[in-house]
């Protein structure tokens, strides 16, 4: 999705530490392979933790439109429905998104539309809670 949104929003994706420009989806995917923890299922050093947060917060940068937020949420809800989930509570950090210049209306407009479609089309009811990262 990160690649899809960057292309739709005419954004260049770069490696957070090297500044290398990703010119294809496969290059971006290859860079994420280096972010996997050494030990299966856990991060046990500062390098792995830093890499995780670089990828996580880097994803916020490509979310610009209501459609982006809708597509992101629907992707999640479709995956939940495929696992026979009928209710999910979505937690998110609104400050992580608003710090990039995205308005509350843009972000929540996409999420709310996806919530309605998830219930009507996928039979997945959803709730939403925000987490305040910085008070």
Model-derived features with residue positions:
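Metal-cofactor-binding active-site regions of metalloenzymes
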Residues: 1-135
